[in-house]
Amino acid sequence: MAVVTMKQLLDSGAHFGHQTRRWNPKMKRFIFTDRNGIYIIDLQQTLTYIDKAYEFVKETVAHGGTVLFVGTKKQAQESIAEEATRVGMPYVNQRWLGGMLTNFSTVHKRLQRLKELEAMEQTGGFEGRTKKEILMLTREKNKLERSLGGIRDMQKVPSAVWVVDTNKEHIAVGEARKLGIPVIAILDTNCDPDVVDYPIPGNDDAIRSAALLTKVIASAVAEGLQARAGQGSGEKPAEGAEPLAEWEQELLAGATAGAADASAEGAAAPESSTDAS
């Protein structure tokens, strides 16, 4: 069965690019035509590239890898958090903090601080402190939760990064490339395909398009988790694959049950990316 259908892509508005005056010439090969001053993306190519990205993500996770989901624009925040959480992967859907990948040792210390503050709050560690001290500690915890909550369980840099809008997330993309971490991303008509290892030509501004493609990537993760656990067709886990952690085993049932949801997207009015900045 196809990972996603042409109809689903059309219904989500994935074929609408930016206005013809706002484009990156490097994207020419992915453009089918232009209509009323708006580029139309070649969805036949999109389907092909989706299959390549899906297979890469599935194999990466099957061999013990993790995928970091990144999308801080308003249209992507909800689906990024929802889909990453569904399959137990880290995500960033608020502001990207410089050095999240290239200076991960420092970021990891901040994560430890977040867990320390949460433990203090839950075990009565705030007792005996002044109201001002409690307020300051609570504010610190909330700030860390907002900026780092999505990567709280990330113990090392990810094996790959999924990005919605490479232009907006250029710092994240740059850090990934600097470390040699493969980038999978939606490529709108104003993006640079040279900075992405596994591109998926499509509309990165429409909520439904971003959600559909993010769900596809999450479903690939779910299938990879299933393969890692040695389930699916009953085969043994791939050689060299890491065993599932306990928390991953708990997530597996729910994650794999939702893996087919990407093919159940309902029809919706298409959204173009012309109104987005």
Swiss-Prot record:
Record keywords: Ribonucleoprotein, Ribosomal protein
Organism superkingdom: Bacteria
GO MF annotation: an example: structural constituent of ribosome
GO annotation (BP), single: translation
Family matches, as Gene3D superfamilies: Glucose-6-phosphate isomerase like protein, domain 1, Helix hairpin bin
Keyword Membrane: no
Pfam families: Ribosomal_S2
Record has Ribonucleoprotein as a keyword: yes
Start-end of Low complexity biased regions: 253-269
Residue segments, region Disordered: 227-277
Record-level GO cellular component terms: cytosolic small ribosomal subunit
Protein family: Belongs to the universal ribosomal protein uS2 family.
Stated name of the protein: Small ribosomal subunit protein uS2
UniProt source species: Mycolicibacterium smegmatis (strain ATCC 700084 / mc(2)155) (Mycobacterium smegmatis)
